[in-house]
């Protein structure tokens, strides 16, 4: 039972971490201000 709980928590935290990482990684592309700071085209 303990192994099942550990495995479930591991999978849940893994998917949550991947989701948060993907959201933070794609966030600068959605906000024009930070995108302009990263790659100024003017």
Curated annotation (Swiss-Prot):
Kindly list the GO CC terms recorded for this protein: photosystem II reaction center; plasma membrane-derived thylakoid membrane
Membrane topology classification? Single-pass membrane protein
Protein's cellular compartments: Cellular thylakoid membrane
Query: Source species, please?
Result: Prochlorococcus marinus (strain SARG / CCMP1375 / SS120)
- What is its quaternary makeup? PSII is composed of 1 copy each of membrane proteins PsbA, PsbB, PsbC, PsbD, PsbE, PsbF, PsbH, PsbI, PsbJ, PsbK, PsbL, PsbM, PsbT, PsbX, PsbY, Psb30/Ycf12, peripheral proteins PsbO, CyanoQ (PsbQ), PsbU, PsbV and a large number of cofactors. It forms dimeric complexes.
Q: Which keywords belong to this entry? A: Membrane, Photosynthesis, Photosystem II, Reaction center, Thylakoid, Transmembrane, Transmembrane helix
Identification of the protein by name: Photosystem II reaction center protein I
The superkingdom of the source organism is Bacteria
Which Pfam families does its entry note? PsbI
Name of the encoding gene = psbI
Family that this chain belongs to: Belongs to the PsbI family.
Where, by residue number, does the polypeptide cross the bilayer? 6-26
């Amino acid at each position: 039972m303990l192994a099942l709980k550990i495995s479930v928590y591991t999978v849940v935290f893994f998917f949550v971490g991947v989701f948060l990482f993907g959201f933070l990684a794609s966030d600068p592309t959605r906000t024009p201000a930070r995108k302009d700071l990263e790659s100024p085209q003017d």
